[in-house]
Amino acid sequence: MSAAISRNWPAPAKLNLFLHINGRRTDGYHELQTLFQFIDYCDMLDFKVTDSSELILHSNMAGVVADSDNLILRAAKSLQQMTSFKGGAEIWLDKRLPMGGGLGGGSSDAATTLVALNTLWNTQLSTAELAKIGLKLGADIPVFIHGFAAFAEGIGERLQVVSPPEPWYLVIAPDAHVSTAEVFQDPLLPRNTPKLAIDTLMSQAWINDCQKLVVSKYPQVAKALGWLLEYAPSRMTGTGACVFGEFTQQQQALAALAKLPSDMQGFVAKGMNISPLITRLNHP
């Protein structure tokens, strides 16, 4: 008898509420201080456990390649190898988040895959063990696995749970693909922001050290940010291209969205300090 499909596992987007670059390490990675918060805008994944060890991925979006390099498949394969689980899975991805926009969609998909399959395969790894697997696949995967808004240091792997305000956001996804690698390799990127204590960082104005460089190189990002700043305090998330504005009320964000120029794409979402993935995990 075939296993039932376990449905509606969310892979939420994240925002970097601030992003400071403190220096460059000898291995080429950058020392960061950043604040991660989730939003209730998610990719959705369904899983079916199979007797075969094969891993099969389906997606609603062209360009999400179902090959061995896909982060979802790499995450599932890593969990198989770590636990010696003999079965496999068929996975369906409903891709809703913009790709390569600084919202962490690929990392979130991988994290949800690890959390869901650890439950469905009954492999019983701890959250810390799952995060260790995730870190080998991407520096920001652990924050999605832990599922709490967090202040992050190092290359983003040292996490401290925090509870920033949970406003409404209008997120705009400019029609531009910003290469994270190119941003971090650019000689004009600021790399000397002083490290500060978390209490100091939480109480001062929040900025993104990548924003000025990206805005100067990508006119689509500059246009979106300039438009959004007319309505709310706004900045870029990650290395872009997505930008977000903060609103205290949902109707304020929706009113701004209604005025969005036709050549821009956007959505309204709520800030969340507890990931929808944690809620799904606790209510199977």
Swiss-Prot record:
Its EC number is 2.7.1.148. Gene3D superfamilies: 3.30.230.10, GHMP kinase, C-terminal domain (3.30.70.890). The keyword Kinase applies. ATP binds at residues 98-108. InterPro entries: GHMP_kinase_C_dom, GHMP_kinase_C_sf, GHMP_kinase_N_dom, IspE, Ribosomal_Su5_D2-typ_SF, Ribsml_uS5_D2-typ_fold_subgr. GO terms for biological process: isopentenyl diphosphate biosynthetic process, methylerythritol 4-phosphate pathway; terpenoid biosynthetic process. The active site is at residues 14, 140. It comes from the Bacteria. Pathway: Isoprenoid biosynthesis; isopentenyl diphosphate biosynthesis via DXP pathway; isopentenyl diphosphate from 1-deoxy-D-xylulose 5-phosphate: step 3/6. GO terms for molecular function: 4-(cytidine 5'-diphospho)-2-C-methyl-D-erythritol kinase activity; ATP binding. Keywords: ATP-binding, Isoprene biosynthesis, Kinase, Nucleotide-binding, Transferase. It catalyses: 4-CDP-2-C-methyl-D-erythritol + ATP = 4-CDP-2-C-methyl-D-erythritol 2-phosphate + ADP + H(+). Catalyzes the phosphorylation of the position 2 hydroxy group of 4-diphosphocytidyl-2C-methyl-D-erythritol. Belongs to the GHMP kinase family. IspE subfamily. NCBIfam families: ispE (TIGR00154). PANTHER family: 4-DIPHOSPHOCYTIDYL-2-C-METHYL-D-ERYTHRITOL KINASE, CHLOROPLASTIC. This is 4-diphosphocytidyl-2-C-methyl-D-erythritol kinase. It comes from Shewanella putrefaciens (strain CN-32 / ATCC BAA-453). The gene is ispE.
